[in-house]
Structures are given as structure tokens and as C-alpha cells.
């Protein structure tokens, strides 16, 4: 009989967290990852659930997520250790019927709790559910090195950073035509940064936290990971270009328009019209 540790969603979390650590995005206990599940995903594994699931109240009610299950990374847990002991480092939680709190159904052993960024994740899930008609299921936060570096040297403006990332790699406009949001620096792990992130998630699938990291969303673990990976690759190119003296030539506005038409995407207007 298959156990929950062999379920697709546990194995998927193991792969995503391991890949992110190998990328260098999630040092120590940095980063967090949540995946929204259907009841049908977890129903076959009820025998593996805790006999007395712990209940934790949310800092604010989230009725849109009522009766919804998630698999989440734990607070203070190292991504590099998820593959070694998923039961200690991951947890399946289910929001209660009025969205006021959640039960820990599986995992997070030894009184562990979900990531401290759970407010930002849950608020962002709410916005991405509305923005994508329920298609987006993953929220991923990590410390992508080159994206962080760019927030020190580029103007921290959504349209400007979006345009530069589009220019850093041709595929970027195709992968994230909705652009990149960016917040002012804020204290992590608070409702305030969660609300600000969620507000930008209404318009963008990527949101930068300057001098800290990035939030990405997507319909699957692969898509969310790939989104961040694509932006980070462009950021790496830009870091090298700026270190070599800056751009001598780049992808033009006309070429970006042609790219959008070819792949049937609508580029973020403010970034496209920033300059020729």
C-alpha cells in the first residue's frame, strides 16, 4: 500500500526544494514553498494523518481558502534536509470551514509549524486563485542570488526592472509578459508584507522583495520553479553585462512587440512603453 511520502505532491515538494537548494537559492532555512491541493489528492492517505491534528489560528480569516488543503514547508526547516526527512520538514495542512485557522494533518513532527511566511503565501494564493480562475496552485519564495543583486543597482521600479529582465534573455517576455512587481523593503514574516505581496500578485506572477528574494506563482511546481529560474537566468546575464561596462545594444521595443505577437502574449504596457 502506498504511503503519503510516495504521493506525487510529497515527491514534487522534495524535488523542488532539493533543486532550489542546489541552485543556491535557499541557504540554511531560507525560502518557503506551498502547493494547493484538492481533497481527492489527500483522501487516499488518511491512514497516515495524525490521530489528533494540531490546530493553529490564522492571524486574519481567509474564507476563500475554507476547506482547502496545502502541502507546505516548515518554519526554520532547511530545504537541503527535505529529501532526507520529508515528514519532519513538510506538512499537509487543511484550512477549516470558516477560514479562521488550519489543522496540521500530516508531517511537521516534533511540534514544528508551517513557514513564517504563511500569511504572505495564503494571501497570495487568494489573489492568484482570482487572477487565474483557480489555475495557479503554487507559491514559491526563495533567495535567488542575481535577482537580489539587481535590486541594489537598478531603480526599484516595476516597469524598469521588468524591461531589463526582458532584455536580459529573449524568452523572458514570453514566460512572464505580465512583468515583475517589486515592493519597498519590508520586515519579513508579517501580515503587512503578505498584504503588499498579494496586492502585486493581482497583476504579476513574480514579485521581488528588494535585498531579500522573490515570490513566484504558477499552476504546477515545475511552472513556478521554471518562472523563477528564467528570471534568475536573465538577472545573471544582466549582472555580467553590467560588470563588463553595460549594454552596447539590446532587444528593442519593436523587437519585443514582434516577440509578443509571435507567441500570443500581451506584454506589460508600462514596461514596453518605457523607451524605444
UniProtKB/Swiss-Prot annotation:
Superkingdom to which the source organism belongs: Bacteria
Family, per entry: Belongs to the aldolase class II family. RhaD subfamily.
Recorded GO CC terms: cytosol
Source organism of the structure: Enterobacter sp. (strain 638)
Binding positions for Zn(2+) per the UniProt entry: 141, 143, 212
Keywords, alphabetical: Cytoplasm, Lyase, Metal-binding, Rhamnose metabolism, Zinc
Main location: cytoplasm
Cofactor(s) listed: Zn(2+)
Pathway named in the protein's UniProt entry: Carbohydrate degradation; L-rhamnose degradation; glycerone phosphate from L-rhamnose: step 3/3
Alphabetical GO biological process terms: pentose catabolic process; rhamnose catabolic process
Annotated function: Catalyzes the reversible cleavage of L-rhamnulose-1-phosphate to dihydroxyacetone phosphate (DHAP) and L-lactaldehyde.
Signal sequence region: none
EC number: 4.1.2.19
Protein name, as recorded: Rhamnulose-1-phosphate aldolase
Assembly and oligomerization: Homotetramer.
HAMAP family tied to this protein: RhaD (MF_00770)
Enzyme class: lyase
Location relative to the cell: Cytoplasm
Gene3D superfamilies tied to this protein: Class II aldolase/adducin N-terminal domain
Active site: 117
GO MF terms, alphabetically ordered: metal ion binding; rhamnulose-1-phosphate aldolase activity
Catalytic activity: L-rhamnulose 1-phosphate = (S)-lactaldehyde + dihydroxyacetone phosphate
Matching SUPFAM superfamilies: AraD/HMP-PK domain-like
Amino acid at each position: 500500500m502506498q504511503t503519503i511520502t510516495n504521493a506525487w505532491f510529497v515527491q514534487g515538494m522534495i524535488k523542488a526544494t532539493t533543486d532550489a537548494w542546489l541552485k543556491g537559492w535557499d541557504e540554511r532555512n531560507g525560502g518557503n514553498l506551498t502547493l494547493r491541493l484538492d481533497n481527492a489528492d489527500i483522501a487516499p492517505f488518511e491512514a497516515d494523518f495524525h490521530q489528533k491534528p494540531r490546530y493553529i489560528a490564522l492571524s486574519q480569516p481567509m474564507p476563500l481558502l475554507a476547506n482547502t488543503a496545502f502541502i507546505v514547508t516548515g518554519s526554520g526547516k532547511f530545504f537541503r534536509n527535505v529529501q532526507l526527512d520529508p515528514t519532519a520538514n513538510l506538512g499537509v495542512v487543511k484550512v477549516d470551514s470558516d477560514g479562521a485557522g488550519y489543522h496540521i494533518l500530516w508531517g511537521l513532527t516534533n511540534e514544528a509549524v508551517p513557514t513564517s511566511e504563511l500569511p504572505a503565501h495564503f494571501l497570495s494564493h487568494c489573489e492568484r486563485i482570482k487572477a487565474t480562475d483557480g489555475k495557479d496552485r503554487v507559491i514559491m519564495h526563495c533567495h535567488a542570488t542575481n535577482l537580489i543583486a539587481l535590486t541594489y543597482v537598478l531603480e526599484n521600479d516595476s516597469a524598469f526592472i521588468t524591461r531589463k529582465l526582458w532584455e536580459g534573455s529573449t524568452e523572458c517576455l514570453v514566460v512572464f509578459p505580465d512583468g515583475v512587481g517589486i515592493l519597498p523593503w519590508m520586515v519579513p514574516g508579517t501580515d503587512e508584507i503578505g498584504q503588499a505581496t498579494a496586492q502585486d500578485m493581482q497583476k504579476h506572477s513574480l514579485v521581488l522583495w528588494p535585498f531579500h528574494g522573490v515570490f513566484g506563482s504558477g499552476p504546477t511546481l515545475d511552472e513556478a520553479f521554471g518562472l523563477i529560474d528564467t528570471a534568475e537566468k536573465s538577472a545573471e546575464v544582466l549582472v555580467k553585462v553590467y560588470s563588463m561596462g553595460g549594454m552596447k545594444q539590446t532587444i528593442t521595443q519593436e523587437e519585443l512587440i514582434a516577440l509578443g505577437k509571435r507567441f500570443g502574449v500581451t506584454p506589460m504596457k508600462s514596461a514596453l512603453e518605457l523607451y524605444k
